[in-house]
């Protein structure tokens, strides 16, 4: 089920991590590095890489490769000096980050890193559309 993420990240994860560490996303990988709940993105790519529900988000988080990478790249975001997600990701992808961090904050409530990203970049606010889709 999660193979689509592993396949996509195989070629792009190192570049994505390097871009985040530099503080500026310059290539196209947001969908499969910071996935969102199904129902937000309308493109075929967004739909393909969407997470269907909280259970799949928990599986992603618990996966030995995907979960570790998500925590690592989220930690890289926390180590940046600034707190403007638009400066790092641009307008649209900064919204995708907020929804992804909201999803994983709910899927892994015992791991503070996702809420810490929300605290730093979004004043602690979670994404309202993600919450609505999840019925929270």
Language model: regions and residue ranges:
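Extreme N-terminal tail/first-helix region
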Residues: 1-14, 129-131
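Amphipathic alpha-helical segments within well-ordered protein domains
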Residues: 17, 58, 101-102, 119
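Short helix-to-loop capping/linker segments positioned immediately adjacent to catalytic or ligand/cofactor-binding
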Residues: 17-23, 84-89
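Hydrophobic/aromatic-rich, well-ordered segments within soluble, folded domains that form packed cores
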Residues: 19-54
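Short helix-capping/linker segments at secondary-structure and domain boundaries
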Residues: 39-45, 105-114
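C-terminal end-helix/capping segment
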Residues: 50-69, 128, 136
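Mid-chain, well-packed structural core segment of small domains
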Residues: 59-108
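Charged phosphate-binding loop/patch that engages nucleotide di/tri-phosphates or the phosphate backbone
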Residues: 109-136
């Amino acid at each position: 089920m999660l193979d689509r993420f592993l396949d996509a990240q195989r070629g792009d994860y190192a570049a994505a991590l390097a871009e985040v560490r530099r503080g500026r996303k310059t290539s196209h990988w947001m969908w499969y590095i910071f996935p969102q709940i199904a129902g937000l993105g309308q493109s075929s790519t967004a739909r393909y890489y969407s997470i269907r529900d909280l259970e799949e988000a928990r599986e992603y988080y618990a996966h030995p490769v995907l979960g570790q990478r998500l925590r690592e790249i989220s930690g890289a975001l926390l180590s940046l000096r600034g707190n403007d997600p638009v400066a790092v990701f641009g307008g649209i992808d900064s919204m995708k980050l907020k929804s992804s961090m909201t999803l994983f904050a709910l899927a892994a409530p015992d791991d503070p890193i996702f809420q810490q990203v929300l605290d730093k970049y979004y004043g602690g606010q979670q994404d309202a559309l993600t919450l609505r889709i999840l019925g929270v």
